[in-house]
């Protein structure tokens, strides 16, 4: 085995041992020393906590007001019935939220196959027992809500303020969305030519049947790769700050000269010179204003004082005046 001392080995052999339709063992080798635990632990955590799936989240049972009760003619108490419903393995196509119904009467077990659903729903474990009816006249009617999600979400985490209006008798169920029932990994020694310090990763997992074990590992590896992509190219991906554009002119310059509340004489003199905005006025000099008919030193002093009270003065230079909004007017 030739290669640079800095070159990492890549797994060349992937062996998949299909024990059953829901149980498989995947062997990956060779791996550099330590990479067996690095990859095995990462994949295990993703498979257990981050795989999407469907689970029962709410149940309504006729005649039942809360989970701490029992129902006449049903062998199990309501808590046990809810626990059994959590064991349903459901596949839903094209929807994230569906409602199923179950209506059964007469002595005998109530199983998942008794649930009524449409073509978008598939119950993978139809023989799964939900409860037992113990009397010929006994019956059970329930409405089951199934939602798509990820990981494990307890009922308490889904209680919101608006849920105070939830009808009495609608029971929340802890939702285990992950389709993976069990996952374990083991790291064994591997050898390639003269190297004996390599790892062999053995992953064994069982699913609830809604996903193939091989596909589950493939999805987990994809999730891990997508998360690590950010480290491959460490660029600053933060959104650039949007700088607020400052107005080209002080808003006071865009106001009409009438807002200065000058005397009638001074105001009329300015209008006669087509000075309509404060921005027009501040660009005039004292000499120019004194040339205005009927505008004397008293009016000039008044104008200067009013402008000074607003932080302005005569003889100011304004680039690009007038602005488009005024020019259009």
Swiss-Prot record:
SUPFAM superfamilies to which the protein is assigned, alphabetical: C-terminal domain of RNA polymerase alpha subunit, Insert subdomain of RNA polymerase alpha subunit, RBP11-like subunits of RNA polymerase
EC code: 2.7.7.6
GO cellular component, one term: DNA-directed RNA polymerase complex
Reactions accelerated catalytically: RNA(n) + a ribonucleoside 5'-triphosphate = RNA(n+1) + diphosphate
GO biological process, one term: DNA-templated transcription
Subunit structure: Homodimer. The RNAP catalytic core consists of 2 alpha, 1 beta, 1 beta' and 1 omega subunit. When a sigma factor is associated with the core the holoenzyme is formed, which can initiate transcription.
Comment on protein domains: The N-terminal domain is essential for RNAP assembly and basal transcription, whereas the C-terminal domain is involved in interaction with transcriptional regulators and with upstream promoter elements.
Protein function: DNA-dependent RNA polymerase catalyzes the transcription of DNA into RNA using the four ribonucleoside triphosphates as substrates.
Family, as annotated: Belongs to the RNA polymerase alpha chain family.
Name of this chain's protein: DNA-directed RNA polymerase subunit alpha
Organism this protein belongs to: Pasteurella multocida (strain Pm70)
High-level lineage: Bacteria, Pseudomonadati, Pseudomonadota, Gammaproteobacteria, Pasteurellales
């Amino acid at each position: 085995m030739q290669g640079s001392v800095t070159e990492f080995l890549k797994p060349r052999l992937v062996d998949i041992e299909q024990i059953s339709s829901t149980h498989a063992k995947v062997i990956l080798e060779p791996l550099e020393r330590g990479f067996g635990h690095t990859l095995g632990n990462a994949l295990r955590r993703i498979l257990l906590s981050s795989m999407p799936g469907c689970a029962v989240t709410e149940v309504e049972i006729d005649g039942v007001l809360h989970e701490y009760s029992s129902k006449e003619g049903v062998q199990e108490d309501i808590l046990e019935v809810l626990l059994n419903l959590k064991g349903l393995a459901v596949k839903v196509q094209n929807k994230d939220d569906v409602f199923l119904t179950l209506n059964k009467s007469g002595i005998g077990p109530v199983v998942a196959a008794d649930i009524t659903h449409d073509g978008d729903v598939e119950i993978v474990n139809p023989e799964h027992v939900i409860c037992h009816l113990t009397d010929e006249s006994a019956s059970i009617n329930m409405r089951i809500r199934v939602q798509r999600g990820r990981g494990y979400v307890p009922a308490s985490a889904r209680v919101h303020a608006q849920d105070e209006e939830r009808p009495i008798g609608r029971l929340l169920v802890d939702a285990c969305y992950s389709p993976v029932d069990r996952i374990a990994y083991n790291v064994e020694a591997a050898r390639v030519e003269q190297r004996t310090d390599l790892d062999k990763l053995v992953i064994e997992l069982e699913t609830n049947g809604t996903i193939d074990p091989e596909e589950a590992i493939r999805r987990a590896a994809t999730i891990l790769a997508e998360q690590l992509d950010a480290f491959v190219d460490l660029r600053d991906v933060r959104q650039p700050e949007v700088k607020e554009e400052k107005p080209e002119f002080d808003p006071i310059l865009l106001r009409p000269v009438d807002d200065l509340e000058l005397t009638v004489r001074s105001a009329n003199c300015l209008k006669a010179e087509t000075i309509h905005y404060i921005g027009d006025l501040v660009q005039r000099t004292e000499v120019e204003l004194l040339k205005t008919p009927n505008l004397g030193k008293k009016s000039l002093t008044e104008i200067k004082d009013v402008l000074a009270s607003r932080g302005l003065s005569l003889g100011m230079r304004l680039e690009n005046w007038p602005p488009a909004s005024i020019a259009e007017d």
